[in-house]
Amino acid sequence: MKIHEYQGKEILRSFGVPVPRGIPAFTVQEAVEAAQKLGGPVWVVKAQIHAGGRGKGGGVKVAKTIDDVKARASEILGMQLVTHQTGPEGQKVRRLYIEDGADIKNELYVSLVTDRGTQKVALIASSEGGMDIEEVAHSTPEKIITEMIDPLTGITPEQSKKVAAAIGLTGASVDQAVDLFAKLYKCYMDTDASLVEINPLNCDSKGNLMALDAKFNFDANALFRHPEIVALRDLDEEDPAEVEASKFDLAYISLDGNIGCLVNGAGLAMATMDTIKLFGGEPANFLDVGGGATPEKVTEAFKIMLKNPKVKGILVNIFGGIMKCDTIATGVITACKAVNLQVPLVVRMKGTNEELGKKMLAESGLPIISADTMAEAATKIVEAVR
């Protein structure tokens, strides 16, 4: 789950990380009132969307008068902001953040992310923060510093000092960095975040550090422990199909292809998508119905997939372990009738009650294409949608 910058900064502030004063705004008038309340003399008008690259896309503007704030807010609010993370369709700006301008001297980068390979938390930092951090990582990777933190011990002052020195901090700024990194790590762990990123982390002319941006991703599986974070969710920023799927406890992610996929188990779902691509097709989605799918959930899964006009065929690939093949067969038959299926459907089932499930499909009277292997299933659905 993602949140907006202004929400992320409130979380950082609650952990003692220094951030500029700012006020969210949902209308141009609210933006003007926010600027008046902050007092100036310089403000930054920021688009609030769940994507990076806002500055390059024209979603971050400096204003030096109240009239400037009004003009910039009018330009940004409601615009379709296109960045390298939104895709060509862009994202509509529905919220703004009006913030005090900052004395920017050096723009640094710092983030925390879980490294699954080492089962540790990676503190990633760079002296080259700002809008071009992706290019820095690509062209000069030696400027990206990574320090692994053992979750059993947490981040140590020695590690923080090492990273601070590596990104060019000196004197009192190092002490500030040690304090900031410790607070950032506590924030990361206490909120069950999967990513906390500050870009840029400003070091001003007096050597003081301040987070000028905040990006958070949270582990969706831990949200039950954080109702205060769930309350920050902005459904307008999410794929409507993914929001709908979450209501039925379906793991769904939209993709760009034309073959809908319904699978039980994340690993099998990824293998199924890979096999479709291997045989020349393009998956339209990742969809894991899980081990406790009911006929009702399967029906809803079909409805969600078929709301995508790109879908020209569906592949159902089920391994019956906890999930029984006859249960899936019942769901598939019910779904086909409920949605009046008009696209090709290939079903491959293996495992518990496999023969019963296949018999039910064969006797359903529906034009369902059967397959015994993943390769056969992928081949048949790719041919069917051509």
UniProtKB/Swiss-Prot annotation:
| MF term (GO), any | succinate-CoA ligase (GDP-forming) activity
State where ATP binds.
46, 53-55, 99, 102, 107
Gene Ontology biological-process entries? succinyl-CoA metabolic process; tricarboxylic acid cycle
Q: Give the catalytic activity.
A: succinate + ATP + CoA = succinyl-CoA + ADP + phosphate; GTP + succinate + CoA = succinyl-CoA + GDP + phosphate
GO CC terms in record: cytosol; succinate-CoA ligase complex
What's the cofactor?
Mg(2+)
Arranged from A to Z, the UniProt key words for this protein are: ATP-binding, Ligase, Magnesium, Metal-binding, Nucleotide-binding, Tricarboxylic acid cycle
- The UniProt record gives the binding positions of substrate as 264, 321-323
- SUPFAM superfamilies xref list: Glutathione synthetase ATP-binding domain-like, Succinyl-CoA synthetase domains
Q: How is the cofactor bound?
A: Binds 1 Mg(2+) ion per subunit.
Tell me what this protein is called.
Answer: Succinate--CoA ligase [ADP-forming] subunit beta
Q: Which organism is it from?
A: Acidovorax ebreus (strain TPSY) (Diaphorobacter sp. (strain TPSY))
> What gene name does this entry carry?
sucC
